[in-house]
Amino acid sequence: MKNTLKKLFGALAFLTLLSAPAGENLFDSAKIIPGKFGTWDAETKTVRVSIPHGTKVSNATEGVRFVPDNAKFAGKTVKFSFKIKTDDVRSIGGKNFHNAKLLLAGATKNDPYWRGSKGFTGTNDWTEVVWRLPFYGDNIRLAAVFGLQFATGTAEFKDIRAEVCDPFEAFRLKQKLPADFKCEYSPAVRNAPRLRGVVAEYYVFDDPTAFDTLEKWNVNVVRLWLGPKGANLNYKTYEAEMERQFKRLKELCPEFEKRGIKVIMTYRVPGGRYSNPQVFGTAGEISRKDNELSAFRIFQSEEWLNLFVRIWENAARTFRNEPAVWAYDLLNEPVQTAECRWNYLEVQQKAAEAIRKIDAEKPVMIASNYWGGVDTFIYLQPLPLKNIIYQFHCYLPGVYTHQGLRDKMKRIKEGNPIRYPSKVDVFGLHAAHHTVEYVDKERLRKNFQPVLDFQKKYGAIIYAGEFSVIRWAPDSDRYLDDMVS
């Protein structure tokens, strides 16, 4: 499997060498093979798959197989698009991927790989699906199957296309900035002292000794978490709960000010994510399976997005004249891997613009895509607003920083922990491109090159919102020293 991740779906640095003309439908020249339950209408260019209820089905995807010219996919990002209509599709296998969809069945050499688009069950009218995927290497064997996986019922597919595209199109803002754009900062923000601190929940400070501890640690900033735990989906009570927590933070502000500790406030996004991802997040490769289910609902739901913006407006009104609150940190670790109504940057832009109508000066922090990753700075765009700070989180390599979590401490108990520095798995953009490398201080430095390039190009201020290593990892002190040196 890891060979496929390296050779089939992977590094986007190779995506500028186009062998297919822009706009060409790569399926037009594909070999089309209808299966037992699938038909292809060449005149209307429509796929129909119908599996009667009661039919014995398996995990195989039954339908119509398209076998394109694989050479045209090599080293490209390809946008797949189609419209799907379903009639009483029932999941028989019971998994969330047992449905009607497009399945990409790929391989390099003898290493198989499957990846599915958004799937559908039940009865649905025509719905458009757009899906972008990068392909790496020149030894690709790929087939696209439009059909039903471990499911029965009827599905139709039309307007079927696959075309080479801009790999970062789905993540960009619509407006263009001047070629010589530079970020604008007030002197107070540009000349602010270097901030050093920790992340904490607001209720930690119900214990007054927490302030003493931070003073001993020489902390001058806290990235402070607010928001109701486990209530992200309760629309009716969310705003009232945030008002209560804003009031509590307001009560704490005099003590923060007295201790010389600034607050960067952030809060749990209303609506949450489509799934509850594990704790791995920025740890790259081990977060790969979370994928699109880790996207926030505000990327698709206008109702939740409006609430998200409204709460930030309330925060600006409450804290614009509060010196202890230094910045608004808008969105914690966004994850966007597919087309959305509003992409990860657009939702932050909406909130930032709303804040600026109320508070013109206090810094606003923008997070990079894919868990605040450092590599996604290669397509991050600056906002044309004053005092915008750009944030990353970094737990790389994740197999070292988060060791013991995925395997239930197996390697630790066996006395075979992952050490630093050492040769480990390293994953690239969107955790798709896999290599095995020796990771030391110089390799860590290489991780941050996209951030440095962004900083120099736009004159941006950068904030390292999170980085650390799990406490039982050997050589953790050396790792942290290298990260900050």
Residue ranges and their predicted role:
Residues 21-183:
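Extracellular and organelle-lumenal recognition/adhesion modules and their flexible linkers in secreted
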Residues 87, 109, 125, 229-231, ...:
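Active-site loop signature of alpha/beta-hydrolase-fold enzymes
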